[in-house]
């Protein structure tokens, strides 16, 4: 089981066909969360270099709260401890943030809402987001996300959480 898997109660598609907003139960905490997610446009290989994977970028909040946290489900082993992720929008420079890794060792997440806000501010107004991570004892992997419609989808997520 992937830690933190969202079991949807309702799904609302955002303005862009790339972003999906849903409200459901988090399988690891059993709490209701609202989530904005997108699968990567590019693939990476699993830790055995046999399968192509599309990591999923998610922004989450709990209804009734304003804090948004970011996470990426890489669907492959990343690390058993905190790791640095690089985020680059369009032709800019990488911004490196130290993120935590969940118990499955496959999901990285921001340690705080303030850290997630850095990523949100970086992504707003951009067209493409590149994310780079170096799995433990492996070569770096990079994935790309389409930021078209992100601003509107983020507004929908915030609306879902403010209720």
What label would you give each PLM region?
Residues 13-163:
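A generic "folded-domain core" signal
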């Amino acid at each position: 089981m992937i830690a933190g898997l969202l079991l949807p109660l309702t799904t609302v598609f955002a303005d862009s066909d790339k972003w999906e907003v849903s409200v459901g139960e988090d399988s690891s905490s059993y709490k209701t969360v609202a989530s904005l997610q997108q699968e990567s446009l590019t693939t990476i290989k699993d830790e055995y270099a046999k399968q192509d994977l599309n990591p999923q970028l998610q922004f989450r909040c709990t209804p009734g709260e304003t804090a948004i946290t970011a996470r990426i489900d890489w669907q492959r082993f990343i690390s058993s401890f905190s790791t640095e992720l690089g985020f680059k929008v369009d032709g800019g420079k990488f911004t490196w943030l130290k993120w935590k890794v969940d118990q499955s060792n496959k999901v990285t997440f921001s340690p705080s809402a303030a850290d997630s806000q850095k990523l949100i501010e970086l992504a707003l107004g951009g067209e493409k987001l590149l994310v780079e991570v170096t799995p433990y004892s492996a070569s770096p992997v990079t994935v790309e996300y389409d930021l078209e419609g992100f601003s509107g989808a983020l507004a929908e997520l915030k609306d879902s959480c403010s209720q």
